[in-house]
Amino acid sequence: MIEPLLCGIVLGLVPITLLGLFVSAWNQYRRGSGMLDID
């Protein structure tokens, strides 16, 4: 029996966390490799 509030919090935080990790990783990759020949 999962509480709806807890379930909602988890379902709300997981995509935000994944998006934040993806954005930070993409920015680091673009900053590090963007100077080669990736326009």
Curated annotation (Swiss-Prot):
Q: Where are the transmembrane segments?
A: 5-25
Classify the main location.
Answer: membrane
An example of a GO molecular function for this protein is: electron transporter, transferring electrons within cytochrome b6/f complex of photosystem II activity
* Compartment(s) of residence: Cellular thylakoid membrane
The family note in this entry says: Belongs to the PetG family.
Sorted alphabetically, which NCBIfam families does this protein's record hold?
PRK00665.1
- An annotated GO cellular component: cytochrome b6f complex
Protein name, as recorded: Cytochrome b6-f complex subunit 5
